Amino acid sequence: MEICPYLEETFKILGRSWNGLIINYLSRCNDCSAHFSDMKRDLKTITPRALSLKLSELAQWELVEKQIISTSPVQIIYVLTEKGQALADALHPIEAWAQTYVELTDQRTAK
């Protein structure tokens, strides 16, 4: 039996640390967008460098778009693209499955 090449490529994205969580996080934000500082605050254990690298990766895959808003001061937000939102929609059933079947192994509690 051959493995689906599309699924294999998708797991190259989702199999990398933080990518799925960032996509899921943005999908739950107003307008599917957030400031870097909000993501850093809410994704508590990610370092600023790792977050920056992950957002760049996701932008290269056209899942996230960096938008610069010309205000004073200038604001930068990260927004899920249509492609990113479609992937986030596919992750929601996985999240529901995890809430039913995955046991948390540390001090985290479900939100």
Please provide the spans of the model-predicted regions.
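Generic structural signal for secondary-structure transition and capping sites
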Residues: 19, 31, 63, 96-99, ...
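Short, hydrophobic secondary-structure boundary micro-motifs
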Residues: 35, 67, 106-107
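Amphipathic alpha-helical dimerization/coiled-coil segments
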Residues: 4, 89-111
